[in-house]
């Protein structure tokens, strides 16, 4: 709960990347993407309920999805700190989209997976992100995460060589999507 009724955000941490509203509106695809969002930017007035005479909120919709880079989850000044949820590194307007629970959940899974993999590799999250981002992305896909624009590239994954069929399917959502690592768009 916010510290002021009617506000939907609290503190934000500064990461190695700050996601902006321009990136969201452009449906940006980042090379180090580990999560995604698609909720409209829901901007609430800074004063909350106390802001009399102001429009309480403004919604900016956009088509498609955007990706959230790893740098939004890694602290920019504390080497061994990661964040997830409503405190990721994003501008105030970008936070209007990233703060919804579905987006927070996929980001939390990415941050948790990265922290575990970094610990196993004996690296800080920041160092891990510089050298192991592809490995992290492939692990997230293997764990049934969706990252727009990324496909399963794991040569050891037998699903890549498998053949899938179904008696019926929705156009564009055939059984082959299960094998590609892109099961939903």
Regions found by a protein language model. Name each.
Residues 147-185:
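Disordered, acidic Ser/Thr/Pro-rich linker "stalks" and the adjacent N-terminal cap
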Residues 1-160:
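Flavin (FAD/FMN)-binding glycine-rich loop and adjacent Rossmann-like elements that form
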